[in-house]
Amino acid sequence: MRIAILGFGSEGQAMLAALKRDPVYRSATITVLDRNKKTSVPKNVRAVAGPAYLDNLRQFDLIFRTPGFPFMNAKLQAARRKGVKVSSVTRYFFEHAPCAIIGITGTKGKGTTTTLLYEILKRTGRSVYLAGNIGLPAVALLPRLRKNDLVILELSSFQLQDLDRSPQVAGVLEIFPDHQDAHRDMKEYVEAKSSIARNQKPDDRVFFADSGWSRWVAKFGKGKKIAVLPSRTRLIAPADMAVPGMHNFRNAVMASAIAASLDVPKETIRDAVRAFRGLEHRLEFVREVGRIRFYDDSASTNPDTAAAACRSFEDPAVLIAGGKDKNLDYATLAKALKDSVVEHVVLFGENREKIWKALSGGHVPAEFASSLEEAVASAYRAARLFSAQHAAVIFSPGAASFDMFKNYKDRGRRFKMIVRSL
């Protein structure tokens, strides 16, 4: 059998190790495919690396794609039509996991929700694992998993799109437009998300945010459907939160509701929420310079999350935004700015003019910067002119990072380095 692994980051490497362990595939010829021409692979493993890495997909019997590679890629679909079987690292994990899986999806907040839920469940003494973008690749956990364990898994639209199984417990956060550069339209994006509930069994549960697309996804569940309403929760209160923003409170309510359904005591939930300090690059406090507080929200890659960041503060603020465009509409951000404490905007990156046009006609002055260094300097200068006792500089790009950086983490680390040098 000729097998290809599509992508050779941490997930692809874990997939290779899993195939080497699996007696079904032990004798297969495995080839690694990766865009990066400097990709290094183990001995006895073939590699096709560089710009032409997708040119001969039809030669394989089976292709495992890693989470970051879209199922609807034209060359992958062409190979599929010619009879090549296409699976994924996530699908392999669902087929082989011996224990219950809790899956969380949504447009943003997945990492925060999964991590907080993990922190809550850890306090009960249960054997629980966190996997996905945060934690280990899920397939790397397979050798150690046992029947009574729990795995909490962050699931993106790319991972869910061709999944034919659903987690026993699903959490659906708010869904709004994203990845429109990789999905044909919003309908395809939301239909991909629906796989988190579509294959559930009658004893399974789906928790969902009470918003339009989230309700639509949840309706496919065959088990119990639970609407999660922050305004009605008695488990936690906004005052219990150490991280700013009502969007973070909504994430915490989702994690708390799922934990409560697993019989976690209310006080255990509340203690974990109070101790939770959030995740890196998600409205992360960096430092205070004079009376100016700097926040890193580099994980914000669409206008809705940037809008949420702007609504999270009470002190006057400067917003730094911009990056690689994903065919998204910035009207949401423009509307949020009108009702927020943001008094100045600094735009940089590939789509800075697109964002500026969306903001035109608003009452918030904006300026351009040619680099992140220049953007931070301009934002700091503007914030120092505010008369309030404290002010904030919010780095919430609302766009992808690939125009100037490796990824959002690289972008966030660069921002923090610049701020610490002030």
Pin down the residues of each PLM region.
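Residues in the short beta-alpha loop(s) of Rossmann-like NAD(P)-binding domains
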Residues: G9, N36, I134, D210-G212, ...
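Nucleotide phosphate-binding/pyrophosphate-handling subdomain across enzymes
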Residues: G12-A18, S127, M241-V342
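N-terminal leader/targeting and accessory segments in enzymes
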Residues: M1-S88, Y92, P244, E367
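Phosphate-binding loop of NTP-binding sites
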Residues: K20, L54-R58, P67-K224, A377, ...
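C-terminal helical cap/extension that packs against the catalytic core
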Residues: V41-N44, A331-A391
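Active-site regions of enzymes building and remodeling cell-envelope glycoconjugates
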Residues: P42-A52, F60, G83-V84, C99-I102, ...
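Residue-level signal for inorganic ion chemistry
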Residues: L19, I63, I104, N133, ...
